């Protein structure tokens, strides 16, 4: 039994294994429970293991590596084309192993427990932000149904709702006022929770030398800096900065054939939250550069905006920032202003 590539279909209790040799032929299949999994892998000579990016993938990656194996995490969308036959654990494990063999396969960057801790902060914060947005939208809709409009911004809602509740002449019933008051209390509570996560992210930022280095890039703040470090670490999974920018989805979608090259909108692949942070920061850079033409960066931004418009310039700045940050993390260097 000469296993070089081992695909493992992860689950809660039952795991399916499929081993391939150098020629890609299946030479090993096994179905094992959670308690027996580690002993099973300990009896297999060191090989390259592939697992899908799912819940617990990074935990198992660290555990398998302690047994002497090399482990790669693959996005499910890259595994699906290699599935043959019906949907079952055996075919899924074999598809993972076949995908693992591909020389051009893109793998998910590994994450340490510390990186996962930081990512958890961002995920939890974003969930609460979405909940607060939904709460404000509900309050706005309920009031508009009674002929009382309020602005769309969160800050406007925070100022307007107390005044509406105190206005005895706006026609709201007592029951409606109590309902809006409860929703407004929920809105304020969510705001306090968001503030808690903001402070936690600031603490992580102050304690991380890498985060502080990349935050010197224009358009990069504590949230983006910590999110980048949590997502890619030192960026060793990427060949270059262009590869990282493409992984983020900050490159044009291509639809070309022969000599006809067609570039479309962004591919919007990869981490949506991280890409959003890059776009927000780049948008601020473009706005500031409008009133300040000093420096090479501002001149480039303004010239590009005249030719391509605000939105395309924003994406171009985000792409440039991503490539700069990858270089800084990969080579452990500081930001050099041109």
Predicted segment positions?
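Gly/Thr-rich phosphate-binding beta-strand-loop-beta motif of the actin/hexokinase/Hsp70
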Residues: 2-20, 96
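Conserved DEDDh/DEDDy metal-dependent 3′-5′ exonuclease domain
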Residues: 43-81
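Extended, structured, electrostatic nucleic-acid-contact surfaces
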Residues: 1-3, 195-220, 228-234
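Phosphate-backbone recognition surface of nucleic-acid-processing proteins
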Residues: 213-216, 222, 226-306, 310
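Low-complexity, acidic/Ser/Thr- and charged residue-rich accessory regions of DNA metabolism proteins
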Residues: 259, 298-338
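Glycine-rich, often acidic, oxyanion-interacting loops/wings at catalytic, nucleic-acid
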Residues: 123-213
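Nucleic-acid-processing active sites and adjacent nucleic-acid-binding tracks
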Residues: 23-47
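Short alpha-helix plus adjacent loop in nuclease-associated cores
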Residues: 72-120, 161-166, 258-273
